Structures are given as C-alpha cells and as structure tokens.
C-alpha cells in the first residue's frame, strides 16, 4: 500500500468528514486515532506514528462545512446536472432524428455529448453526495466505477474535441479532399474510447475503499487513491502524464488547428460579383465563425486549467489541500459539460427547430405545427449534407459562385460556426 500518496489524498475528504459545528463532545478522527478507537480503523500497513503525523498535517487549511456551504453546493451541482443532461440528451435526439445530420462530424458531436452525460451521471452526483454526507455511501464497486468514469469521460471529451478540430481543419484548409466517412468516424470513436480506457484504468485500479469508526455511533467510508510504492513518485508522474495527455496536448492541437482555420477564413477573398450587402453578410459570417472557434478554445482552457493545476501541484507537494478550492475548481471543470451542446449545436438551424418542437410538445400547444418550418427543404442551404462517397453536396442559391470549388478556395457558407457543421 502506498502510504504517503493515500495519506495526502485523505486530507480534503477527512476535513469534510468533520462535524459542521466542530463540537467538543464529538470525538472525531483525532480522538479515534489517539484512543482505544484506533483499532476500529481498517488499515493493515500503517503504523500509529504514520497516523499521528497525518493528523498533524490534517490541520492545514481546515475549515468547517456549515449548512449554508452545503446548500450552495447542492444548488450549484444540481444546476450542472440538470442543464448538462437536458442539453446533451437534446443533442443526441436531434442528430438521431434527422437523417441529414448523420455524418462523421455528427458522430463526434454525439460522442462528446455521451461523454458529458457519462460524467454528469457517474461523477458529479457522487462528489456532491460524498461532500454533503461526509462519507462514501455507494460501496466498493462504485468507488472504482466513479473514478474510472471521471477520467474516461474527460479523456473522451478532450480527444473528441481534438477530433472535431482536426475535422474542421481538414474541411476548410483542404476543401477538395474527401470528407471523413461515417465508417471512418466510427473507427475513430472506437480508438478514442480505447485510448481513454487505457489512460483511465490506472486511476480506477488504484482506488480503494477505507472504512473507519468516526465515533461511537458513526462508521464512515472514504474512497481514495492507494498508489503502489514508491507512492509519491507514482502519484506525481501519473498526474503529470494525465495533465499532459488530457489538457496540454489536446489544447495545443486544438489551438493550432483553429488558429489556421481562423487565419484562412479571415484572409480568404470573395469569389465572383457580389453586392455590398452580400459582402457585409459574408464578413459578419466570417467574424461569427472566428468568434466561435476562439470560444471553443478559451472555454476548454479556462474550465480545466484550475483543477488540473491544483491536482498537479498537490501531487508534487507544492501546496497543501484546501477544501474550498477543490470544490470550486471541481465545479468549474464539471460545468464544461453544460457549454458544449450550446457551443456546437445552438447556432444550427435544425437544432433550433427541434428545440422549439420539443418545447411545444411539453407546453401542449394547440397548433405545434406553427413552430415548424413551412418546408423541409431550406431555401438557402442544407446543413451537414454528405454523400456516401464523402463529398459534399453543393448548396443551392449560394451567394458565391460554385466554380470556386474547383479553384481550391474556401466556401464560407459551408463552414458556419461549427455551426452548420458541414
């Protein structure tokens, strides 16, 4: 058993395990360790001096968990759960319902939504309940499953965002090359999940359920990492590898891909004779696309940077644990599951139509047909169209001449903010 790694990981959870008011008549952990209750701890490889040293270190940054803080956390995490489930389930519903939207790009969007749903269901509620109850109540099996779901979902999300960025780069920078087929998209998604599983297994395997008698009437459990020796180095380099593979490398690829795309969209020239109104419309669309690409990178970087840095610094022993910081950073990272559906799909016309139809059904309007478009065929262009041979269908009534497809120029109307996800 890795002593130091497990001991350091115990810090934030055992702080949360303290009584909210910290009354003197409650023995708590220190009394249990110092007195006869020490035998109630189910640890086989620790000496009593280890626990005495740990109790002394536990005082760093200790803060009480009062009912107000717990209530705020319940509201904050509930907000994430509700909006994440609603947005991501709606994304899957819209894409599976519309056959025109079934392309490789759509598969990546669904895969991202599934990863967000997985972490919303198998990690976010467990973190909340663990904090509110000051103990792990889900058993040994879920101790491993929850940690695996957290890391696997994060890897899948990062790799899928990278795949989407590479796909957008391919479409815009090389418009004459064949698109990724649905079959290849399925293969790429399989590879993504295989890689995510491989990277997540060490975290899941090293989880262990520890049980101790907190007081005469209370027995509590903690789901914590239990790294093999040398535990310090194992923990440090595992978190470092996760930080690089889960955050730095995907962010670097996404940033480079979208920077090149933004440059191409901004510098590309309008082909053919267009009016001033048409030119201004294309320029607005160009700015809109660039803003969306920048938003994707910024949100991905901002949401995960605090938590990744906190975990990395903690495993490197640069900082001590801080309960308030941990839950603030964790909530901020988990909130990223709410943003992706709106970033990638909210500006898509088909998505808006299905959302209006769904809301009409929920409200039981007498004439829901009024919310639907007059014709299933759009008058300007068809989003996400793709033939089986991987080439795009030329849009009708386009502002730009179709002859530019043979000149290697980029058609702005086919690359709306991921927007049309063409």
From Swiss-Prot:
Main location: membrane
Residue ranges crossing the lipid bilayer per the database entry: 71-91, 107-128, 145-166, 186-207, 238-259, 293-314, 327-347
Keyword Transmembrane: yes
UniProt key word Transmembrane helix: yes
Extracellular membrane side: 17-70, 129-144, 208-237, 315-326
Localization terms from the record: Cell membrane
InterPro entries xref list: GPCR_Rhodpsn (IPR000276), GPCR_Rhodpsn_7TM (IPR017452), NPY_rcpt (IPR000611)
SUPFAM superfamilies, sorted: Family A G protein-coupled receptor-like
CDD domains linked: 7tmA_GPR83
Glycosylated residue positions: 37, 45, 133
Entry keyword set: Cell membrane, G-protein coupled receptor, Glycoprotein, Membrane, Receptor, Signal, Transducer, Transmembrane, Transmembrane helix
GO cellular component: plasma membrane
GO MF annotations, alphabetized: G protein-coupled receptor activity; neuropeptide receptor activity; neuropeptide Y receptor activity
GO biological process: G protein-coupled receptor signaling pathway; neuropeptide signaling pathway; phospholipase C-activating G protein-coupled receptor signaling pathway
Pfam hit, one: 7tm_1
Signal peptide segment: 1-16
Family of the protein in this entry: Belongs to the G-protein coupled receptor 1 family.
Additional facts recorded: NPY has been reported to be a ligand for GPR83. However, a more recent study found that radiolabeled PEN binding to GPR83 is not affected by NPY concentrations below 1 mM, only very high, non-physiological concentrations causes a partial, displacement of PEN binding.
PANTHER family for the chain: G-PROTEIN COUPLED RECEPTOR, G-PROTEIN COUPLED RECEPTOR 83
Name of the protein described by the UniProt record: G-protein coupled receptor 83
């Amino acid at each position: 058993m890795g002593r130091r790694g497990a001991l350091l990981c115990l810090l934030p959870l055992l702080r949360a395990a303290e009584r909210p008011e910290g009354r003197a008549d409650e023995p708590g952990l220190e009394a249990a360790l110092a007195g006869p209750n020490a035998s109630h701890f189910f640890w086989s490889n620790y000496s009593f001096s280890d626990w005495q040293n740990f109790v002394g270190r536990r005082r760093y940054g200790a803060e009480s968990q009062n009912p107000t803080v717990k209530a705020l956390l319940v509201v904050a995490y509930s907000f994430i759960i509700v909006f994440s489930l609603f947005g991501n389930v709606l994304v899957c519903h819209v894409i599976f319902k519309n056959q025109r939207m079934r392309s490789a790009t759509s598969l990546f969007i669904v895969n991202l939504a599934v990863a967000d749903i997985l972490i919303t269901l198998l990690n976010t509620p467990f973190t909340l309940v663990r904090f509110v109850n000051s103990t792990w109540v889900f058993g040994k099996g879920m101790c491993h499953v929850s940690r695996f779901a957290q890391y696997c979902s994060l890897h899948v999300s990062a790799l899928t965002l990278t795949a989407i960025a590479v796909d957008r780069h391919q479409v815009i920078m090389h418009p004459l090359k064949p698109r990724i087929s649905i079959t290849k998209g399925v293969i790429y998604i399989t590879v993504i999940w295989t890689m995510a599983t491989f990277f997540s297994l060490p975290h899941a395997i090293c989880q262990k359920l520890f049980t101790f008698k907190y007081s005469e009437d209370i027995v509590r459990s903690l789901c914590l990492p239990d790294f093999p020796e040398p535990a310090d180095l194992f923990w440090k380099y595992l978190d470092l590898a996760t930080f690089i593979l889960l955050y730095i490398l995907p962010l670097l690829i996404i940033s480079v891909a979208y920077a090149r795309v933004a440059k191409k969209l901004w510098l590309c020239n309008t082909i053919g004779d267009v009016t001033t109104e048409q030119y201004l419309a294309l320029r607005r669309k160009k700015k809109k696309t660039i803003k969306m690409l920048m938003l994707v990178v910024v949100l991905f970087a901002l949401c995960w940077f605090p938590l990744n840095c906190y975990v990395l610094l903690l495993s490197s022993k640069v900082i001590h644990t801080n309960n308030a910081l941990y839950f603030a950073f964790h909530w901020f990272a988990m909130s990223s599951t709410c943003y992706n559906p709106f970033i990638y799909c909210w500006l898509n016309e088909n998505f808006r139509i299905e959302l209006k139809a769904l809301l009409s059904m929920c409200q039981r309007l007498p004439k829901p047909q009024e919310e639907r478009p007059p014709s299933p065929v759009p008058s300007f262009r068809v989003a996400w169209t793709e033939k089986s041979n991987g080439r795009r269908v030329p849009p009708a009534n386009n502002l730009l001449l179709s002859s530019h497809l043979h000149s290697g120029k980029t058609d702005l109307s086919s690359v709306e903010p991921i927007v049309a996800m063409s």
